[in-house]
Protein backbone atom coordinates (compact mmCIF):
# COMPACT_ATOMS: atom_id res chain seq x y z
CA UNK A 1 0.00 0.00 0.00
CA UNK A 2 1.30 3.47 -0.85
CA UNK A 3 1.66 5.81 2.10
CA UNK A 4 3.53 8.96 3.07
CA UNK A 5 5.20 7.15 5.98
CA UNK A 6 8.59 5.47 5.80
CA UNK A 7 9.00 1.86 6.88
CA UNK A 8 10.83 3.01 10.03
CA UNK A 9 8.05 5.48 10.90
CA UNK A 10 5.46 2.72 10.53
CA UNK A 11 7.46 0.43 12.82
CA UNK A 12 7.76 3.17 15.45
CA UNK A 13 4.02 3.94 15.31
CA UNK A 14 3.10 0.25 15.52
CA UNK A 15 5.30 -0.27 18.57
CA UNK A 16 3.99 2.93 20.22
CA UNK A 17 0.43 1.71 19.62
CA UNK A 18 1.37 -1.47 21.50
CA UNK A 19 2.49 0.64 24.48
CA UNK A 20 6.26 0.56 24.05
CA UNK A 21 8.33 3.53 25.29
CA UNK A 22 10.65 5.33 22.90
CA UNK A 23 13.69 3.91 24.71
CA UNK A 24 12.34 0.37 24.29
CA UNK A 25 11.65 0.97 20.60
CA UNK A 26 15.19 2.30 20.17
CA UNK A 27 16.59 -0.97 21.52
CA UNK A 28 14.31 -3.06 19.29
CA UNK A 29 15.24 -1.07 16.16
CA UNK A 30 18.90 -0.70 17.09
CA UNK A 31 18.91 3.09 17.07
CA UNK A 32 18.90 5.98 19.53
CA UNK A 33 15.91 7.20 21.53
CA UNK A 34 16.42 10.63 19.94
CA UNK A 35 16.10 9.09 16.48
CA UNK A 36 12.90 7.30 17.51
CA UNK A 37 11.56 10.61 18.81
CA UNK A 38 12.33 12.32 15.48
CA UNK A 39 10.78 9.44 13.49
CA UNK A 40 7.61 9.60 15.58
CA UNK A 41 7.36 13.39 15.39
CA UNK A 42 7.79 13.44 11.60
CA UNK A 43 5.29 10.60 11.19
CA UNK A 44 2.70 12.51 13.22
CA UNK A 45 3.33 15.65 11.14
CA UNK A 46 2.76 13.65 7.94
CA UNK A 47 -0.44 12.16 9.37
CA UNK A 48 -1.70 15.63 10.29
CA UNK A 49 -0.97 16.90 6.77
CA UNK A 50 -2.77 13.90 5.26
CA UNK A 51 -5.82 14.54 7.47
CA UNK A 52 -5.83 18.22 6.50
CA UNK A 53 -5.55 17.28 2.83
CA UNK A 54 -8.54 14.93 3.08
CA UNK A 55 -10.57 17.58 4.91
CA UNK A 56 -9.67 20.11 2.22
CA UNK A 57 -10.71 17.63 -0.50
CA UNK A 58 -14.06 17.08 1.24
CA UNK A 59 -14.49 20.84 1.54
CA UNK A 60 -13.75 21.37 -2.16
CA UNK A 61 -16.33 18.70 -3.07
CA UNK A 62 -18.92 19.77 -0.51
CA UNK A 63 -22.59 20.05 -1.35
CA UNK A 64 -23.17 23.15 0.79
CA UNK A 65 -20.62 25.45 2.39
CA UNK A 66 -20.98 28.63 4.44
CA UNK A 67 -18.27 30.86 5.84
CA UNK A 68 -18.56 31.83 9.48
CA UNK A 69 -16.77 34.94 10.71
CA UNK A 70 -15.19 35.40 14.13
CA UNK A 71 -17.77 36.87 16.51
CA UNK A 72 -20.77 35.46 14.64
CA UNK A 73 -23.56 34.05 16.84
CA UNK A 74 -23.93 30.32 16.17
CA UNK A 75 -27.71 30.61 16.48
CA UNK A 76 -27.73 32.51 13.16
CA UNK A 77 -25.74 29.83 11.32
CA UNK A 78 -28.46 27.19 10.65
CA UNK A 79 -30.68 29.69 8.80
CA UNK A 80 -27.69 30.83 6.74
CA UNK A 81 -26.84 27.18 6.01
CA UNK A 82 -30.41 26.27 4.99
CA UNK A 83 -30.64 29.32 2.70
CA UNK A 84 -27.42 28.33 0.94
CA UNK A 85 -28.66 24.73 0.62
CA UNK A 86 -31.95 25.92 -0.89
CA UNK A 87 -30.05 28.12 -3.32
CA UNK A 88 -28.05 25.15 -4.65
CA UNK A 89 -30.97 22.68 -4.43
CA UNK A 90 -29.64 20.46 -1.65
CA UNK A 91 -31.78 18.98 1.12
CA UNK A 92 -30.00 19.22 4.47
CA UNK A 93 -30.66 16.09 6.57
CA UNK A 94 -30.25 17.99 9.86
CA UNK A 95 -32.54 20.15 11.97
CA UNK A 96 -31.64 23.57 13.35
CA UNK A 97 -31.09 22.02 16.79
CA UNK A 98 -28.81 19.33 15.35
CA UNK A 99 -26.69 21.91 13.53
CA UNK A 100 -26.34 24.04 16.67
CA UNK A 101 -25.41 20.95 18.72
CA UNK A 102 -22.81 20.02 16.10
CA UNK A 103 -21.34 23.53 16.22
CA UNK A 104 -21.16 23.53 20.02
CA UNK A 105 -19.38 20.16 19.99
CA UNK A 106 -17.03 20.64 17.01
CA UNK A 107 -16.60 24.29 16.04
CA UNK A 108 -14.32 26.90 17.60
CA UNK A 109 -17.10 28.60 19.59
CA UNK A 110 -17.33 30.09 23.04
CA UNK A 111 -20.45 31.56 24.64
CA UNK A 112 -22.40 31.16 21.36
CA UNK A 113 -19.81 33.14 19.37
CA UNK A 114 -17.31 31.93 16.78
CA UNK A 115 -13.79 32.37 18.18
CA UNK A 116 -12.24 32.51 14.69
CA UNK A 117 -13.26 32.30 11.04
CA UNK A 118 -14.22 28.82 9.85
CA UNK A 119 -16.50 27.08 7.38
CA UNK A 120 -19.39 24.72 7.98
CA UNK A 121 -20.01 22.33 5.14
CA UNK A 122 -22.04 19.30 4.16
CA UNK A 123 -19.68 16.72 2.68
CA UNK A 124 -20.39 14.28 -0.14
CA UNK A 125 -21.72 11.73 2.40
CA UNK A 126 -24.15 14.22 4.00
CA UNK A 127 -22.02 14.70 7.11
CA UNK A 128 -21.54 18.11 8.68
CA UNK A 129 -17.90 19.14 8.82
CA UNK A 130 -15.87 22.09 10.08
CA UNK A 131 -12.93 23.41 8.07
CA UNK A 132 -10.69 26.41 7.70
CA UNK A 133 -11.61 29.21 5.36
CA UNK A 134 -9.81 28.73 2.08
CA UNK A 135 -7.64 31.68 1.13
CA UNK A 136 -7.33 30.52 -2.45
CA UNK A 137 -8.94 32.91 -4.90
CA UNK A 138 -11.89 31.44 -6.72
CA UNK A 139 -11.01 30.25 -10.18
CA UNK A 140 -12.97 32.13 -12.78
CA UNK A 141 -14.25 30.10 -15.72
CA UNK A 142 -13.86 31.65 -19.17
UniProtKB/Swiss-Prot annotation:
GO terms for biological process: DNA-templated transcription initiation. One of its GO terms (molecular function) is DNA binding. The keyword Transcription applies. Pfam families: Sigma70_r4 (PF04545), TFX_C (PF14601). It comes from the Archaea. Keywords: DNA-binding, Transcription, Transcription regulation. The keyword Transcription regulation applies. Putative transcriptional regulator. Belongs to the Tfx family. This is Putative transcriptional regulatory protein PF0535. It comes from Pyrococcus furiosus (strain ATCC 43587 / DSM 3638 / JCM 8422 / Vc1).
Amino acid sequence: MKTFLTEQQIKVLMLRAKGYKQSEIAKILGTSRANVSILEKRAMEKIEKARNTLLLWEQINSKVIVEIKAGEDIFSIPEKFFKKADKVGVKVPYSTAEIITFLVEHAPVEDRLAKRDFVLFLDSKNKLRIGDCLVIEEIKED
